[in-house]
Amino acid sequence: MRNAQKSSGMPFHRYTPFQDQITVEMPDRTWPDKVITKAPRWCAVDLRDGNQALIDPMSPARKMKMFDLLVRMGYKEIEVGFPSASQTDFDFVRQLIEGNHIPDDVTIQVLTQAREHLIERTYESLVGAKQAIVHLYNSTSVLQRRVVFNQDEDGILDIALQGARLCRKYEETLADTHITYEYSPESFTGTELEYAVRVCNAVADVFEASADRQVIINLPATVEMATPNVYADSIEWMSRHLHPREGIILSLHPHNDRGTGVAAAELGYMAGADRIEGCLFGNGERTGNVDLVTLGLNLFVQGIDPMIDFSDIDDVRRTVEYCNQLPVPERSPYGGDLVFTAFSGSHQDAIKKGFEALERDAAAAGKDVADVTWQVPYLPVDPKDLGRSYEAVIRVNSQSGKGGVAYLLKNEHSLDLPRRAQIEFSGVIQRRTDTVGGEVSGAQLWQIFQDEYLPSGKADGQWGRYSLGSVKTETDDDGGMTLHASLTVDGAQVSRTGTGNGPIAALLNILTQDGVDVRVLDYSEHALSEGGNAMAAAYVECAVGERVLWGVGIDANTSMSSLKAVISAVNRAIRDAQS
């Protein structure tokens, strides 16, 4: 097949390939053979890196709500602000400390640049804290060295070392606070690896990194510049060359400029990282920080404990939306409104069969469904494990098929339609959506079903030539049955009698006397619930003249439900012939 694509005409020549800017060579890479088996150390940076990117930065009340959420979910390292950058951030750090809001097993993290008055102010904010991470950073990239700082490599290294020494100096003012240091060569992805490791190792030496006093070296993809495998190569290279490695907690801080922040974080973790910084639902500058929800639940669906509680994902989403004043997109992995929803007919059918297989497997194992291995097509996680219901799993529109329609009827109304009846009713829905368009809600689906099969006071309009009232049966010595039925025929009350080898056959005899040619082709029934007072549903496939249609009947009496189903099929055939 000929490729018909043409040049875009866009000025792509203005952009330099990453490999022509930064060399990352790792021919003996080992990370592709690694498998993730446990969660990394997490650090949530919603209150600083996320907050600075908001159109309307969080108020103190919204910050506290976000902090409480992060603590409740299980995050043990939480970046809470840049206290030297604003009075608001400083006051929030003080509020957390003085109000005893920080649990003993949670470490707050504060950010600072490498200038003395900023570092001094940072330490002032931490007075009274039990433990804290002081996060020092300066930009090291080729581009920023040239256009922002106008400094050579040695000049930028001096900035980092001066900042590290000042941190050690002011550490003495916090004798009762356990300080852990973190250093970030900002714009790491735009920095030569040899230079990045030179700066990081020099800073780690000032901080006296050791197995007993570990230092966090954080390698940010401040701007995502290449494919995730390149980031992973750079992380493995750094992991091999940082020293002392046992004294280093290697941390990642991916952004999402190319849309691959999650992949970069996962591959970087495989490449030797120990820790990942990010935000819930990927908030952050430009296209955002890496999404901690996606990262955590990607582990969960692989059978790995994320060490974070996502069991009420809707509450997490609502809180984040309130605090950030930004919506979480409907397609956001795991947390969006539509992520567990199937509109496609083939998908719906597979999901329906998956649920049925799950129930069979659980019954065979003598277990509750919640205790067996989750295996349902198109659903990588059980929505109930995240606090969701199954209500939104299947929704009906013009792309839907019998599986979705059948699932909704069974899940919401306990009606388990035979397969051919599913096909017939899905055709009714298809004609409706083709004509009207849009989605059919569960309530609308039920209304359409009633209007089609169960004309009653709840139907949109009364229709049908026949309506069945009371019945009485008599059985003779030969097993034959006589049915005395009270019917409404064309609006008039009549009493009719028919005979046959059962109640359905006797009703067919009555209808034949009335000039209706009807035969039963298939029949099934089931209880709608358990217990002695359960309603029964009957499904009867009838040939009425040249038309083959299904009828449905619901009644507390099984025989009555089957008779109503025959009347339903006959009425539908007559209406169909008249339309």
Curated annotation (Swiss-Prot):
* Pathway(s) per entry: Amino-acid biosynthesis; L-leucine biosynthesis; L-leucine from 3-methyl-2-oxobutanoate: step 1/4
Q: Which GO terms describe its biological process?
A: L-leucine biosynthetic process
Pyruvate carboxyltransferase domain: which residues?
Answer: 40-314
Which PROSITE patterns does UniProt cross-reference here?
A: AIPM_HOMOCIT_SYNTH_1, AIPM_HOMOCIT_SYNTH_2, PYR_CT
Residue ranges of coiled coil: none
Q: Which UniProt keywords apply?
A: Amino-acid biosynthesis, Branched-chain amino acid biosynthesis, Cytoplasm, Leucine biosynthesis, Magnesium, Metal-binding, Transferase
Q: Tell me what reaction this enzyme catalyses.
A: 3-methyl-2-oxobutanoate + acetyl-CoA + H2O = (2S)-2-isopropylmalate + CoA + H(+)
Query: What's a GO cellular component annotated to this UniProt protein?
Result: cytoplasm
Report the GO molecular function annotations. Answer: 2-isopropylmalate synthase activity; acetyl-CoA C-acetyltransferase activity; magnesium ion binding
Summarize where Mg(2+) binds, as residue positions: 49, 253, 255, 289
Entry-linked NCBIfam families: leuA_yeast, PRK03739.1
Protein family membership = Belongs to the alpha-IPM synthase/homocitrate synthase family. LeuA type 2 subfamily.
Q: What does this protein do?
A: Catalyzes the condensation of the acetyl group of acetyl-CoA with 3-methyl-2-oxobutanoate (2-ketoisovalerate) to form 3-carboxy-3-hydroxy-4-methylpentanoate (2-isopropylmalate).
Provide the protein name. Answer: 2-isopropylmalate synthase
Source organism per UniProt? Pseudarthrobacter chlorophenolicus (strain ATCC 700700 / DSM 12829 / CIP 107037 / JCM 12360 / KCTC 9906 / NCIMB 13794 / A6) (Arthrobacter chlorophenolicus)
Name the gene that codes for it: leuA
